[in-house]
């Protein structure tokens, strides 16, 4: 399994001949190395409905005939836009032909904001994502605060790599993320959701230096690890 980081919270997983994208915010993302028009994808996993996570989902899904796996309300909202969706919810898991997906808790918001009409559409609960294939497990925490049930996520799952937000302001910051890393017990921890906007500027190298009992790894856009 090859797992690569592409700026902000964008993660790509390549396994068994399939390509999976998590939170494909590409257009307008100054930190990504990907262009939506060049991306080929079989499945898209979404943690929640904010624009910097849904991103280019509709365009990518339609162009590639990709399935979008998302919390129920968000999946329903996207299905109304002509997207092939598979709705799930927190605590639920499903075995797909590309791997197993399970949604976990995350403490954040989830909505679609229409700036032009000044409306906000509720898109369900935010989630974290556990993805398992080839006997390897990836945990993408989505946007979240620190919460104590991360201990359960670590106890119940043998996590090979965890992608944790460190940007602060909208999510947990580096100090809380260090504790999150301890609780989820991943072998490798990669920081995400930082430096895309001024309000979430952080030094990822300082973060990984503080990690204990795991390998911290800063991935620049386009860099990958093999599990």
Curated annotation (Swiss-Prot):
GO terms for molecular function: hydrolase activity. Keywords: Hydrolase. Pfam families: Lactamase_B_2. InterPro entries: Metallo-B-lactamas (IPR001279), RibonucZ/Hydroxyglut_hydro (IPR036866), UPF0173 (IPR022877), UPF0173_UPF0282_UlaG_hydrolase (IPR050114). Gene3D superfamilies: Ribonuclease Z/Hydroxyacylglutathione hydrolase-like. SMART domains: Lactamase_B (SM00849). PANTHER family: UPF0173 METAL-DEPENDENT HYDROLASE MJ1163, UPF0173 METAL-DEPENDENT HYDROLASE MJ1163-RELATED. Belongs to the UPF0173 family. This is UPF0173 metal-dependent hydrolase BALH_4194.
């Amino acid at each position: 399994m090859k797992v690569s980081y592409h700026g902000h919270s964008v993660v790509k997983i390549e396994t068994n001949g399939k390509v999976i994208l998590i939170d494909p915010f590409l257009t307008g993302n100054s930190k990504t190395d990907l262009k939506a028009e060049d991306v080929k994808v079989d499945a898209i996993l979404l943690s929640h409905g904010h624009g910097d996570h849904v991103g280019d989902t509709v365009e990518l899904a339609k162009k590639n005939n990709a399935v979008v796996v998302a919390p129920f309300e968000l999946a329903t909202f996207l299905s109304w836009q002509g997207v092939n969706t598979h709705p799930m919810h927190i605590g639920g898991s499903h075995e797909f032909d590309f791997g197993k997906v399970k949604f976990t808790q995350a403490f954040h918001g989830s909505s679609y904001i229409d700036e032009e009409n000044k409306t906000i559409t509720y898109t369900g609960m935010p989630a974290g994502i556990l993805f398992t294939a080839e006997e390897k497990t990836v945990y993408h925490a989505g946007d979240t605060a620190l919460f104590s049930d991360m201990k359960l996520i670590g106890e119940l799952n043998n996590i090979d790599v965890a992608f944790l937000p460190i940007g602060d302001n909208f999510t947990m910051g580096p100090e809380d993320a260090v504790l999150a890393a301890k609780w989820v017990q991943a072998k490798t921890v990669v920081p995400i959701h930082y430096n895309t906007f001024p309000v979430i500027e952080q030094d990822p190298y300082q973060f990984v230096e503080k990690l204990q009992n795991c390998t911290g790894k800063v991935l620049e856009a386009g860099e990958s690890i093999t599990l």
